[in-house]
Amino acid sequence: MRVPRLSWCGISSFGFRHFDFGARILARAPLLKLKVVPSVETVCPSASGGSSTTPMPHDLPKAYDPTAIEDHWAEYWVRENLFAQPTPKPGSTSTHDGSASEASGRRKSESDGQSPFVILLPPPNVTGSLHMGHMFEHTESDILARWHRMRCDRVLWVPGTDHAGIATQMLVERQVVSEGTTRQKMGREAFVERVWKWREHYGGTILGQMKRLGASVDWQREYFTMDERLSVAVREAFVKLHEQGLIYRGAYIVNWCPRCQTAISDLEVVYDEHKGHLWEIRYPVIGDDGKDTGEFLTVATTRPETMLGDVAVAIHPDDDRYTHLHAKMLRLPLTNREIPVILDEWVSRDFGTGAVKVTPAHDPNDFALGQRHNLPSINVMDETAHINAEGGAYAGLDRFVARKKIVEDLEAQGLLAGIKDHTLNIGHCSRCKTIVEPRLSLQWFVKIQPLADKAIAAVRPDAEGKKAIRIFPEQYEKVYLEWMGNIHDWCISRQLWWGHRIPAWSCAVCHKMTVAREDPSQCAHCGSEKITQETDVLDTWFSSGLLPVSVFGWPNITAENRADFDTFYPTSLLVTGFDILFFWVARMIMLGCWFAGDVPMPDGTKRELKESVPFREVYIHALVRDANREKMSKTKGNVVDPIEIVKQYGTDAVRFTLASMASPGTDIAFNIARTEGYRAFANKIWNAARFIFMNVDRAAEIDIKVDPAVLGAMPTVGADAPLEARWIVAELHATVANVNKSLEDYRFDVAAHLIEKFFWGDFCSYYLEIVKLRLDFSDPAKKTATRAALTMLIQVFEVSLRLLSPFMPFLTEEIWHTVYDGNPPAKSIALTQYPQSDNSKIDHGARGAMIVLENLISETRALRKDIGVEENAVVPIEVCAGPGLNASIGGGYEPFLRENLAIVERLARASEVRFVQQISAGLLRRHAYAGDVAVIYEATIDVPAERERLTKDIAKYEKGLASAERQLGSEGFLAKAPLHIVDGLKKQEAETRLLLEKARAALAALPG
């Protein structure tokens, strides 16, 4: 009869199938489930035991199928609300020391000793679907959230979506047009209602994808930026800034998108280099008698269509060429309008002809010039960039059609002096790619400098050298400060219907504005009921910039309703991309510092800047590019769809790929081959689990039992334990220490490589194979040794699963639940404690000794590959021990190898190990630590063919090495090449040099 597995409640110890205290009872009573008190060492306070909702027991199938596993656990995590963080009870708020230098922004809670770790998800557009940038960002955030949760921190990761004003309105407008109507025909109210319906039906795509990919967010706190509670915060912020004199309305030059028909911010303009022209136009000079003198002042322009709105021509006061034209009047070509010549030192004498047309309504520099000289502004284009009535005969023409027509007319009248080629940067709308038009428009602005001053102070060190906010990598801190130091007032109004409508009402009687928190019924100035609300909406970034305060209850922070704010604000960390550093990050810092600063601390004292910031740290992640480091775009056809890759390889493999490549400050060259490799890694772990379960079953059948009390905590060994046990424990402690340190430093790549190296390299490739030698179920005399080996195997495997869990949550969850036969002590491995190391448990001698064995085994394996030995073939090897000694291996190389002969023979697939004074003639050899090793293979080697192959390889390696050395020796190359290119070339050089040395050695060893 097969003995059933044992289930028991204890996060710290695996409920492995058979243990000391009940194997005989279990054999008689297959349905009995025993319970054992867990070791508190690995239990987080928030962890709870299994429940009736726990999945039914199941064995690990032979084949690893990530899709089936991931669908199941993704649904389970959401259904069980495993990652929910409830509002703290009154009085259980956290204490703050306000220092961003504290590791990962962690803070201790007085009530339970837990440290809040709070992340705000950068809200994706409600119109969006997951792309590789999202998955990369979510992977990093989720690793950190799961890691902190397993460190028993109070983790809150808040999800949500942005209403995305322009993008959403454009999408719904296209749908409306396809139905044969327009938003204008529908009217504002009906159109906005249509957008809300669209959002209800299609707006949750990306969040659904996040759920499928296992993001450990608190779904109960999901927000939408136009939710009622957030809308209240938006209106309060606008009104408060207006009351403080920091919001004003005025006519200024803005970036106008003719396609979106709205103003857009400087950050929403993308500049591309284009080859254009510089048109030189003759402006007739008017004499004192009001008649043309026959002289012309030639003006250079890149936009001749805007000349219809010229109000002056400016020259430098010290330009001797034009001294005689001071105070003269000119006749504006094609319009017959008279305009003055003005003097301004802003004019560059070296550009064009040194005379510039002044068009205040269509150029920001000209607008400033017009303000200085009290010039009028003539707007000659409408919202669609067509010439308006001010353009006379050109009215109704598209701007570029008008340009062509104007140039033709100028030439026909002899007023076109010349055309020169000219390269210029042209701004495009980042959403619709339409060329942006600088346009004079009545807009709402935030007087930004007072807010910026606080945001700058938050990032700069204070008198004690501490920063309220740390930006990492540090180069982005400099970029942030430079941008903030040159910031301009923020245009916050958008000519859209979808968004937060500006809470301002104009009066038809007194013509003043009423700004109010609640919709007014009459003018606040004259009492008239003839008031009309502003039609514009607020910039999307205004509402999203308030999220760190608004999601935690601001502005309604009262004594009864402040637990969330006091516990979770400031948040700990923001993980985001460089592309929204100024769009979003800077604005959150400005608005957060400004508004949170007015919220008293829990004890009633004034909130200092360090407690007003929206987050303690900002981690700027890299961009995900294709395998050739090209930016992904639909145009290039190189876009990688993460959902499709996940379907093929599994979420865990894609997550681990992204984590392994996440080096701070270096863009990721996503390569599907890496994902294939990590899919194999996941399969390796799966097979290791099946091997362990199989051997636990076998052991139980002969009454070999494992004491559950030893499981769960970090394993320890005595000095008399076998080498492999002392070594694997040392490696485990060292790996755990380094992984924790790497995650504290946001080195996801280093942490991933450490885990891979340990789990695949140390545990699976070496330790598991050595343990097979110790598991002897047939010899009663070896029962104690078998039990010890099996116990250590299970201990190390359990810790390894917890170590890997934040990176591969689905795989580890499945194996963990299977270990417990579907009745685990907690609902998830994510609620267990993350491994913690003890440096005193690292046996450096054992590590050094295993390096010797690993070196011999790896060199032997390489030799087998070189001479074509079949993978499963067992053949003799020769070992020539050198004179070198090492403290790790005691008396010498040969005695050490003889002591561990069984390990060498098994892992090197050697039928025997022959110790010789000299490697036999004709054998290929490799240097292995303190000696040489050769493989004796009774197969005919075609020596001439092998010599020819090696000669070609040597020539190839020499050529490649010379090329790499030439590039690395070039100062010009080193100065201009990106760091990742230089590092890659150095790595390539080292690898090529090693291959060359091995090929030369192999050639020299050939007989004849």
Feature map (PLM): residue ranges:
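Alpha-helical recognition segments enriched in aromatics with Gly/Pro capping
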Residues: 345-346, 373-385, 496-499, 503-509, ...
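N-terminal catalytic cores of NTP/NDP-binding nucleotidyl/phosphoryl-transfer enzymes
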Residues: 108-172, 225, 234, 299-302, ...
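Catalytic adenosine-cofactor/nucleotide-binding cores of aminoacyl-tRNA synthetases and other
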Residues: 428-432, 624-628, 632-715, 820-825, ...
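Acidic, turn-prone loop/beta-hairpin segments
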Residues: 162, 254, 258, 265-270, ...
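Non-catalytic terminal extensions that flank enzyme cores
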Residues: 34-132, 155, 417, 430, ...
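C-terminal low-complexity, glycine/proline- and small-hydrophobic-enriched intrinsically disordered tails
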Residues: 676, 817-1008
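Secondary-structure capping and boundary motifs in well-ordered enzyme cores
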Residues: 115-121, 136, 140, 160, ...
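Residue patterns forming the tRNA-binding/recognition surfaces of aminoacyl-tRNA synthetases
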Residues: 58, 63, 71-72, 76-80, ...
